[in-house]
């Protein structure tokens, strides 16, 4: 780590390679090698090294999150989605990972990905008790994208009375206005309303 602190990334990576040649199961050397490669801007090599590491240390959630970030930076969103799926399998109650997964799927953008994104935005909204602003905006945006593409939505959420409510984007938009009214009143609320109106699919 002294070499890394001095910005000597290539020397650091070479050192970790020597350590791993002698001790392939050295967990710390694997992780520091990834950091050294990232420090050099070698994102593809860092992703490859991290993939090799995760083949052995599959329970390292921090590693899966980092690999997802690397894949996003490389424009490899389907690979990033796979990494986030590993996080969701480990901790399905983490609303932030549902939101992240949905955002990556929304970036992929085909109809199947958008429908799945909508389901995970709905899960994030439920798990966060309606306080995940990113998921709320995402639910509205994905519904608009589905409507624009002519694809149907498949998400149904439960209303307070126990009946099924299909208008997830409508509920999300209402909650967003409520949150901004409570926490950021003033000129921001009309801007939020205008943004939501622009996103809502025309009927």
Name every feature range the model reports, one short phrase each.
Residues 23-24, 57-58, 91-93, 128-130:
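Short coil turns that delineate tetratricopeptide repeat
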Residues 94-203:
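Eukaryotic alpha-helical solenoid repeat scaffolds
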Residues 18-19, 52-54, 86-87, 123-124:
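Canonical positions in the second alpha-helix
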